[in-house]
Amino acid sequence: MLTADDKKLISQIWTKVAEHGGEFGGEALERMFITYPQTKTYFPHFDLHVGSEQVRGHGKKVVNALSNAVKNLDNLSQALAELSNLHAYNLRVDPVNFKLLSQCFQVVLAVHLGKEYTPEVHAAYDKFLSAVASVLAEKYR
């Protein structure tokens, strides 16, 4: 459960993240593909090389979805319902992959935000991304 302090930290840091949507999202996906190569199977039609425009484009979509989640921290289930349906019923993505991408996204945040990515911010984002992953996996139950 996100506290009021968590929500404040998430929103404050997100303004910096959103400015670099394609870059941060693309880097997170690239890290996931390198670290967890089995995740590439969901993107057979993509050029998965580092710096690929397709990966950056999808990374921007990921960050846009997270932006929607940040705007709706009190109602993530409703905000992400359509995305949850898409991944569960159409794309049939194994929900463990949401957690893998969350881990990679946190590494990207730490790299780019440096000292601003304090232990408190890290904890808030860990809770936030875990909540997002849980909501995206709701339709699998």
UniProtKB/Swiss-Prot annotation:
PROSITE patterns: GLOBIN. Pfam families: Globin (PF00042). Red blood cells. One of its GO terms (cellular component) is hemoglobin complex. Keywords: Heme, Iron, Metal-binding, Oxygen transport, Transport. One of its GO terms (molecular function) is peroxidase activity. Gene3D superfamilies: Globins. InterPro entries: Globin, Globin-like_sf, Globin/Proto, Hemoglobin_a-typ, Hemoglobin_oxygen_transport, Hemoglobin_pi. It comes from the Eukaryota. Involved in oxygen transport from the lung to the various peripheral tissues. Heterotetramer of two alpha-D chains and two beta chains. Belongs to the globin family. This is Hemoglobin subunit alpha-D. It comes from Rhea americana (Greater rhea).
